[in-house]
Curated annotation (Swiss-Prot):
Primary location: nucleus
Gene label: htb1
InterPro entries, per database record: Histone-fold (IPR009072), Histone_H2A/H2B/H3 (IPR007125), Histone_H2B (IPR000558), HISTONE_H2B_site (IPR055333)
A molecular function (GO) term: DNA binding
Alphabetized SMART domains for the sequence: H2B
Biased composition (Basic and acidic residues): 1-10
Cross-link (Glycyl lysine isopeptide (Lys-Gly) (interchain with G-Cter in SUMO)): 8-9, 26-27
Listed Low complexity bias regions: 11-22
Protein name in the entry: Histone H2B
Lineage top rank: taxon: Eukaryota
Subunit relationships: The nucleosome is a histone octamer containing two molecules each of H2A, H2B, H3 and H4 assembled in one H3-H4 heterotetramer and two H2A-H2B heterodimers. The octamer wraps approximately 147 bp of DNA.
Residues modified as N6-acetyllysine: 8-9, 15, 26
CDD domains listed in its UniProt record: HFD_H2B
Role summary: Core component of nucleosome. Nucleosomes wrap and compact DNA into chromatin, limiting DNA accessibility to the cellular machineries which require DNA as a template. Histones thereby play a central role in transcription regulation, DNA repair, DNA replication and chromosomal stability. DNA accessibility is regulated via a complex set of post-translational modifications of histones, also called histone code, and nucleosome remodeling.
Length: 141
């Protein structure tokens, strides 16, 4: 008998909203649109934008500890870094394709930096990159 009583309670709970169909449907429709609207807000949220601003700021403080940077200048530098990385990646991809390789190694990156950056800037970039790779390799072991 107890299980039947338990079954009756949910069924009576189900009957109570069914008794006032018209108002319940209107409320549910309102709830659905409100839920959908709040669901849209939750889905939209804040999309995370990956930038190099924290790294640029750290380098700035290493070079000039008492100097600040505006948001616009940071945005310009971020665009610059993205552009250079894209150029290097594209060139490295072409080099790998020319050599019929499916993997971009440090050699392709180094060659693409030499091709993209002019003269002395390329030399400094290659030496800093080599130093960074050496440091990473020694710390990984």
């Amino acid at each position: 008998m107890a299980p039947k009583a338990a079954e009756k309670k949910p069924s009576t709970g189900g009957k109570a909203p069914a008794g006032g169909k018209a108002p319940a449907e209107k409320k549910e429709a309102g709830k659905k649109t409100a839920a959908a609207a709040s669901g849209d807000k939750k889905k939209r949220g804040k999309t995370r934008k990956e930038t190099y601003s924290s790294y640029i700021y750290k380098v700035l403080k290493q070079v000039h500890p008492d100097t600040g940077i505006s948001t616009r200048a940071m945005s310009i530098l971020n665009s610059f870094v993205n552009d250079i990385f894209e150029r290097v990646a594209t060139e490295a991809s072409k080099l790998a394709a020319y050599n019929k390789k499916s993997t971009i190694s440090s050699r392709e990156i180094q060659t693409s930096v030499r091709l993209i950056l002019p003269g002395e800037l390329a030399k400094h970039a290659v030496s800093e990159g080599t130093k960074a790779v050496t440091k990473y390799s020694s710390s990984a072991k």
